Amino acid sequence: MTKTFFELIQVAIGTRICLSQTPSADEWGELYAMAKKQSLVGVCFAGVQRLQQQRQELPEMLYLTWLGMAAKIQQRNEVVDQQCKELWNVLHKAGLDAAVMKGQAIGCYYGELSQLRLSGDIDVWVKGGFDTVNEYIQRTVPSDDIAYHRFHYNVYSDTEVELHHRPTLMRNLFDNKKLQRWCDGVTPDEFIVNRKGFAMPPARFDRIFILTHIYAHFLFSGIGLRQIMDYYFLLKNTSASEDEEMLLKQFRLTRFAGAMMWLLKDKFGLENDKLICDPIEDEGRYLLREVEYSGNFGHSDERFRGFSTLRKMTQRGAHLLWHYPSEVIWTPIWLVYHKFWKREHRNKVYNVRKKFA
């Protein structure tokens, strides 16, 4: 990614007034391609509009293409926001303590750029554990598509929905136990009903949770700048809690957090007083290279194209072992553990489903 692309991002998010030089027509085309790869077409269009006021304009046809894409993103956000509101209200009326996580919830921190963030699926954390979520799902829209932390819940034909009985996980079983204990400590009383009409977790939770989510995708599939930007807006618009430094150490996130802080400070312009820890430049530059390869959730990574899922995971793990050994080394053990976990809990799914057949 070029210096100019990061300048465009900074213009879009308000940490820069204009580009250091006006791009040529070809360079504008490259900027649009980078924005698409990183799933930032909508947010970057806000930068394009601001640059027009500075007389740094792009070719008309590209502008119209970009405008059309941004309009579609806005329309899609309206749909997904409404689905989040509807789903949360249904869960709430059913007596479940639920909060929308990630995606549309994090979008609330984007301010006026909220509707330009590219939406994805809907993730809802339902407190009460596996049995509570399982019984609700089998009673309403039955599903046996389960994992350690979530069910697929096929309630919308055009939007993927996951109901989480755990918000997230770590593959190191000891670290995961600590993480689950910490997640359990977040009470439904802390959930916040936002201006869009659905509940979301408190900022103190999101500041650690979103980092673990990005970390997991970075290790096992890849991340793009959209995920980095989510964390930028979250940190920019929230305040630190007293136990953050301890939690970073406890979950072995200090090195990755340092990499993220370098990237957010150097490339996004996040202020020093908003950083969650000290930046680590070497790790940050390594992270940036991986982001350049991967694109959004690793969809643009050509290095492992055509590999089986297992081989891709093995190759990527070997690639990252030196930097983040704990999660990588624990992966084979985790996969065996998860296989037996799924076997046991799928039986629970079928037993509950029989009750409502």
Where are these regions (language model features)?
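Conserved NTP-donor binding/palm subdomain of two-metal-ion nucleotidyltransferases/polymerases, i.e.
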Residues: 1-120, 125-357
